[in-house]
Curated annotation (Swiss-Prot):
Name the UniProt record assigns to this protein: Probable pectinesterase/pectinesterase inhibitor 6
SUPFAM superfamilies xrefs: Pectin lyase-like, Plant invertase/pectin methylesterase inhibitor
Residues carrying sugar: 119, 172
Gene designation per UniProt: PME6
Protein's UniProt keywords contain Disulfide bond: yes
Localisation: Secreted, Cell wall
GO biological process, one term: cell wall modification
Length: 554
């Protein structure tokens, strides 16, 4: 009897052994996801160079993944600040061509936004900074660098702009942002493991998220009935469903002088000066044609612009690349402030197909919503530049690459009209510009109708990891049997992700589609669900809060 007792370990010893095993396994799972050295990043030599010269460098063999993340992001932010300072000094040179000066001004604004995005991507930034938020910010920063270079491409200055632009510095910053994104993604995966294995003790930064009701992948935005991001107005609930919203407008714009202002930009400028304490500011724009170029800056958040309906309230302009404006600056309406909402407005660029790039609307607004709006143009009509965006019940008209950019965007229940292009042009609906595999970006066209005036392709890859999905759409007869068009030769055909799921209509047959490695006929619900509002856009909280109708599933 006594002998048997000695051979049988006490229950508490079993428990301790099991806990120890779980802890070791948990730590192993956690460490497998972290990036803790430059050699694990996409661009190790750039990482080594800037980390070794960083005043923040405190690396040693014991540096953990979270610390390494913070050091990489901080080093990258230092580079962005230095580059902004350098480019700011270059614009003073009187010998610069006016086109080069235009491109430099774009770069300055984009660097300023990049610094802000890098600041947002730090884990220490605010209690509402989730892993997905941080990846979104860094994806936007990558888009900014690409857009800076595009300004020089617009004017065919890429072969000579090294004379007046710090090209290598810019390239290194772009690579450093890519490194920051890779490290951030790895840290996010580690945080997910930490939630699964709380015994690791690495739950410091994930507790904030789960305490706000966002413990799963599909609820990363921290939205619940009680807790929203600090900039999100607490009163912003079902606002678009309120028939009295226009009567409650803070500012009214009317061409006939019956409102507070006669131009939209005047109202926007006034909005910037009003103390709001995170309240939604509503601008009601009465029916009329407003010939102006409107800019809503990054600092002007939570603005809602409501018109009297499509083709009743019209904002129109004609800036274009041919006449000396960069694609970025050509937008008739440009919005960068987060939380922007538009309803019942037509945004238009009338430059015409012969003027090439001419944007009707550009948006870099995170958590932006466009409801029952129309976007009219030809080449480059709708510039979904960066961040998270949702469009519902909208009409989009164009010819070449007329839905383009590097946002994470879903267009739901929209009508897409491909106009007749110029002679020698080919109609392409999308040109999504995801550049790095770790970016969260892509376009999803869901439950929409595609009508075409001539043969039209669903899209082509503007950048190497372009991602676009058409699902449950009605595709017109003139959609090309091949479906998709190459950009140039074999560029991106293996690294892009193009998908189709459950489409109908005369142009929906996939039997003649391209055979590229990156093209996918999505056959399972599991794969298709990756591209829903809930999973791809994390929109089941922030979109629902606005009152816009939304299908968060398939």
């Amino acid at each position: 009897m006594d002998h048997k007792i000695l051979l049988t370990p006490p229950k508490s010893l079993y428990t301790k052994c099991i806990i120890t095993i779980i802890y070791v396994v948990s730590i192993s799972h956690l460490n497998a996801h972290f990036i803790t050295s430059c050699k694990q990043t996409p661009y190790p030599s750039v990482c080594d160079h800037h980390m070794s010269n960083s005043p923040l460098k405190t690396l040693d063999d014991q540096t953990d993944g979270f610390t390494f993340h913070d050091l990489v992001v901080s080093s990258t932010m230092d580079q962005a600040v230095q580059l902004h300072r350098l480019v700011s000094s270059l614009k003073q040179h009187h010998s610069l061509h006016k086109h080069a000066t235009s491109a430099l001004f774009d770069c300055l604004e984009l660097y300023e936004d990049t610094i802000d995005q890098l600041n947002h991507s730090r884990r220490s930034y605010g209690q509402y900074s989730s892993p997905h938020d941080r990846q979104t910010s860094l994806s936007a920063a990558i888009a900014n660098q690409d857009t800076c270079r595009n300004g020089f491409r617009d004017f065919k200055l890429t072969s000579s702009y090294s004379k007046y632009f710090p090209v290598q510095f810019h390239r290194n910053l772009t690579k450093s942002i890519s490194n920051s994104l890779a490290v951030t993604k790895a840290a996010a995966e580690a945080e997910a493991v930490a939630e699964k294995y709380p015994s690791t003790g690495f739950t410091k930064f994930s507790k904030q998220r789960s305490s706000a009701g966002g413990g799963s992948h599909r609820r990363l935005l921290l939205f619940s009935d009680e807790k929203f991001p600090s900039w999100f107005p607490l009163s912003d609930r079902k606002l678009l469903e309120d028939s009295k919203t226009t009567a409650k407008a803070d500012l009214v714009v009317a061409k006939d002088g019956s409102g507070h202002y006669t131009s939209i930009q005047q109202a926007v400028n006034a909005a910037a000066k009003l103390p709001r304490r995170n309240q939604r500011l509503v601008i009601y724009v009465k029916a009329g044609v407003y010939r102006e170029n409107v800019v809503i800056k990054k600092s002007i958040k939570n603005v809602m612009v409501i018109g009297d309906g499509i083709d009743s309230t019209i904002v129109t302009g004609n800036r274009n690349v041919q006449d000396g404006t960069t694609t970025f600056r050509s937008a008739t309406f440009a919005v960068s402030g987060n939380g922007f909402i538009a309803q019942g407005i037509t945004f238009e660029n009338t430059a015409g197909p012969e003027k090439h790039q001419a944007v009707a609307l550009r948006s870099s607004s995170d958590f932006s919503v466009f409801y029952a709006c129309s976007f009219k143009g030809y080449q480059d009509t709708l510039y979904l530049h960066s961040s998270r965006q949702f469009l519902r019940n909208c009409n989009i008209y164009g010819t070449v690459d007329f839905i383009f950019g590097d946002a994470t965007a879903i267009l739901q229940n929209c009508n897409i009209y491909a106009r007749k292009p110029m002679s020698g042009q080919k109609n392409t609906i999308t040109a999504q510009s995801r550049k790095e595999p770790d970016e969260t970006t892509g376009f999803v066209i869901q439950s929409s109708t595609v009508a075409t005036a001539s043969e039209t392709y669903l899209g082509r890859p503007w950048r190497s990891h372009s991602r676009t999905v058409f699902m449950k759409c009605n595709l017109g007869a003139l959609v090309s049997p091949a479906g998709w068009l190459p950009w140039s030769g074999s560029f991106a055909l293996s690294t892009l992700y193009y998908g189709e799921y459950g489409n109908t209509g005369a142009g929906a047959s996939v039997s003649g589609r391209v055979k590229w490695p990156g093209y996918h006929v999505i056959k399972t619900v599991t794969e298709a669900e990756k591209f829903t509002v809930e999973n791809f856009l994390d929109g089941n909280y922030w979109i629902t809060a606005t009152g816009v109708p939304v299908n968060d599933g398939l």
